[in-house]
Amino acid sequence: GTGQGGTAADAEGGAAGNPEEISPEEAAKITILEDYQVLYNVLGELRAEVEKSMVSVTAVTSDVNWINDTLENTGVTSGLIVADNGRELLILAGYRELEDADSISVSFGGDQKEAAVKEIDQATGLAVLAVPLSELSEEQRNGITYASLGSSAGRALVGQPVLAVGSPAGAGGSVCYGMVTSQGTALGLLDSNYKLLTTDIYGSRSASGVI
């Protein structure tokens, strides 16, 4: 009787001491998933850093209908804080949504500040907006991060991972990941030449933002 009890205890202890083994194939899958998680964590940190330089730009256009009621239409696009000139905060944005606007405002953490179009580049469809620094609170000024613009000149970018922030999917605050698929196409526009980069990121008709 005593011998049988000892045997049962030994069996239970052995079962508890031997965890279920994982096959090499399963271990490899787990490693790949962990690597993907690490990659997306890094991309997420980069996205959060870049978004510190992004703002939402709202353009308001007024019109009058057939019974003389005033109608307001709004368009929203993404803006990139690039610099200041000591008096104004300078923001780069697409001009398409702003072209016929009666008023333009920029959102700083939900606080709307009036902006004016300072410069327009018709060739690229970009505009520089200006917001007086005096209109921003000290907290807002301290929270501003100026974007660091990159250059693709002389760099082999095909196959490089990229992320689009701003409103790449047509919704504010969205983010898309992809890679550069080509960089060899040259664009000859008025008084200038540009290199066209393409990616495999889905392009929404209402998209705006930066890569």
Which stretches of residues belong to each language-model region?
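A conserved glycine-rich beta-strand in the N-terminal activation segment of trypsin-fold
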Residues: 35-45, 61-93, 112-114, 146-148, ...
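Short, conserved beta-turn/loop elements at beta-strand boundaries and strand-helix junctions
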Residues: 62-63, 74-75, 84-87, 99-100, ...
